[in-house]
């Protein structure tokens, strides 16, 4: 599409960045990928490997939230399209395909499934799919103790913005879950 010819921008502490980098390489689209300076070298190298010559990695901010804010500002200043890491219907739907893959790999419905939560996109997508396919499966979201923003939000009954997060839990260190992801997670977890 026309909008992609200018390139794309995303922010991630790892998994989303790798997926976007892979897509940039396959589709021959230039991408700017913002990651916190605390991102482990192994994740940075994976993004570089997947994106090859089609991605620029920008390390900025101590947390995902700071890198995300910088990426959004850059996308607004440029004519590039911002690809949100989790709080977007299409991203959630795409992550829901993992739920489908899970159902294809087992002979009968699972009793329990544990899903990691950062911003809640993966838990929303997989959880929504599995809730429809296996209504009796207990879906359990797992967050690090140092950045349990979804847990705090579910307990409060609304999206909560944590004051502090532990930067050590880089891949799931999100101060605030998405509004869409919170809405889905409160129904499926």
Model-derived segments and spans:
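Helix C-cap/helix->beta junction micro-motif
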Residues: 27-29, 78, 133-135
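Short, well-ordered coil/turn elements that cap or connect secondary structure elements
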Residues: 3, 51-52, 77, 134, ...
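Active-site-proximal loop->helix
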Residues: 8-11, 16-74, 129, 149-162, ...
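Conserved acidic residues
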Residues: 6, 80-81, 111
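General beta-strand structural signal in soluble alpha/beta enzymes
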Residues: 10, 59-60, 82-85, 115, ...
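Gly-rich Lys/Arg/Thr-decorated short loops/hinges at beta-loop-alpha junctions or inter-strand turns
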Residues: 76-82, 165, 186
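Glycine-rich phosphate/pyrophosphate-binding loop at beta-loop-alpha junctions
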Residues: 21-22, 32, 87-188
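Helix-rich "cap/lid" substructures immediately adjacent to catalytic or cofactor-binding pockets
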Residues: 1-7
């Amino acid at each position: 599409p026309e909008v992609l010819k200018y390139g794309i921008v995303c922010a991630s502490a790892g998994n989303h960045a790798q997926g976007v980098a892979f897509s940039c390489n396959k589709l021959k689209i230039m991408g700017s990928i913002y990651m916190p300076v605390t991102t482990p070298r192994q994740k940075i190298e994976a993004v570089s490997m997947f994106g090859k010559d089609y991605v620029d990695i920008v390390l900025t901010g101590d947390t995902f939230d700071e890198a995300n804010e910088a990426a959004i500002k850059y996308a607004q200043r440029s004519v590039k399209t911002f690809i949100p890491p989790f709080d977007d219907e299409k991203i959630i739907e795409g992550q829901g395909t993992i739920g489908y893959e899970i159902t294809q790999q087992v002979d009968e419905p699972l009793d329990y499934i544990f899903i990691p939560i950062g911003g809640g996109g993966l838990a929303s997508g997989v959880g929504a799919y599995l809730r429809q396919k296996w209504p009796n499966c207990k879906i359990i979201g797992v967050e690090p103790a140092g950045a349990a923003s979804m847990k705090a939000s579910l307990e409060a009954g609304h999206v909560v913005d944590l004051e502090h997060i532990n930067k050590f839990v880089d891949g799931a260190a999100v101060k605030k879950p998405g509004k869409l992801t919170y809405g889905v997670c409160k129904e499926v977890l």
